[in-house]
Amino acid sequence: MAKTLSKSSGGALAPWLGISLIVILFDQLTKIAVLKTFAYGAMHALTPFFNLTLIYNRGAAFGFLATAGGWQRWAFTALGIGATLVICYLLKRHGHQRLFSLSLALILGGALGNVIDRLIYGHVIDFLDFHVGAWHWPAFNLADSAITVGAVLLIYDELRRVRGAR
């Protein structure tokens, strides 16, 4: 008979880590392809509003602290590793909560994808460039997308939980 998970027992960590691993693999494979295909700073238009490019981000989201002098590489790496530990703890404890755990798995995969870049290259590889006319959204990557989707799902899950408690 299959063992069922109760709210008090937490849940299996492996499925959620598997999702994180898939995010990391897709993120790293796309970055490798972009590094091998594009010159730094070149833009390749795919649609009137979307380009592929190769940008190095030494800061955080939207280039925050990109010119800070190098310390940010290690600070953001440490932050990513710290987030990994907290997320793994939460996944182990709340693995039975599917939407919550999915959101954390996506955030974990994205965070580790960018940590890998910082450790290997000293910066994060960004390549997705959306724009309207001459205005460009800051370039980003699949890891950033996974973090964003995970954060949106986390907010949705919390709103759903709070509304259900009323």
Curated annotation (Swiss-Prot):
- The record's principal subcellular location, in a coarse class, is membrane
| Task of the protein | This protein specifically catalyzes the removal of signal peptides from prolipoproteins.
Q: Which UniProt keywords apply?
A: Aspartyl protease, Cell inner membrane, Cell membrane, Hydrolase, Membrane, Protease, Transmembrane, Transmembrane helix
Broad enzyme group: hydrolase
Against InterPro entries, the record matches this protein to: Peptidase_A8
Pfam families, sorted: Peptidase_A8
Q: Does the keyword Thylakoid apply?
A: no
The organism named in the record is Burkholderia mallei (strain ATCC 23344)
List the subcellular locations: Cell inner membrane
GO MF annotation list: aspartic-type endopeptidase activity
Q: Which reaction does it catalyse?
A: Release of signal peptides from bacterial membrane prolipoproteins. Hydrolyzes -Xaa-Yaa-Zaa-|-(S,diacylglyceryl)Cys-, in which Xaa is hydrophobic (preferably Leu), and Yaa (Ala or Ser) and Zaa (Gly or Ala) have small, neutral side chains
Domain of life of the native organism:
Bacteria
| The family this protein is said to belong to | Belongs to the peptidase A8 family.
The name under which this protein is listed is: Lipoprotein signal peptidase
Q: Does the keyword Hydrolase apply?
A: yes
PROSITE patterns, sorted: SPASE_II (PS00855)
- Can you tell me where the transmembrane regions are? 10-30, 32-52, 71-91, 100-120, 135-155
Q: How does it sit in the membrane?
A: Multi-pass membrane protein
